A protein has these predicted regions:
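The feature captures the beta-strand-to-loop junction immediately N-terminal to the Walker
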Residues: 34-36
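ABC ATPase C-loop
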Residues: 149-150
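Conserved ABC ATPase signature
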Residues: 132-136, 140
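Conserved structural motif at the start of ABC-family nucleotide-binding domains
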Residues: 3-5, 18
Length: 151
């Protein structure tokens, strides 16, 4: 099991935003969270990443309990969100954007290997390495946001 969420409960004051949410994601599996505005999709993701406080519930990533880890430690576990709107650094190059994805890491050889993995997944980014990210098409910007998350 890659990600396991058990009995997640989140409240905003008196409003119960999540009530006992549980789900599993296996390696290689793709799931979707579907619901109307205010249904709790973003709250669920923010809870998993510990960007908001949970009242109760447990979260396991790759077999490790990450329920109480801080958001930066969760990122170090390689559990990353790529939000809507891409949120790239438009005035920086594609290369600089990708490098920012590895800012918490020190192992240069590992960073280089991960960069090559990104280029295998998104060869277009390698072609545009020196280009300003803001000049990429919308799809290319989404590739860049995902590539940065993989770094």
């Amino acid at each position: 099991m890659m990600l396991e969420v058990k009995d997640l409960n989140v409240s905003y004051g008196a409003i119960k935003a999540l009530k006992g949410i549980s789900f599993n994601v296996d390696e290689g599996e793709i799931i979707t969270l579907i619901g109307s505005n205010g249904a709790g999709k973003t709250t669920t993701l923010h809870s998993v990443s510990n960007l908001i406080k949970k009242q109760s519930g447990t979260i396991f990533f790759e077999g490790n309990d990450i329920t109480t880890l801080t958001a930066d430690k969760i990122v170090r576990q390689h559990l990353i969100q790529v939000p809507d709107g891409r949120r790239i650094f438009a005035n920086l190059s594609v290369k600089e954007n990708l490098e920012l994805g590895a800012f918490l890491r020190n192992d240069k050889a590992e960073i280089k290997r991960d960069l090559e993995k990104v280029f295998v997944l998104f060869p277009r980014l390698k072609e545009r390495l020196k280009q300003n990210a803001g000049t990429l098409s919308g799809g290319e910007q989404q590739m860049l946001a995902m590539g940065r998350a993989l770094m």
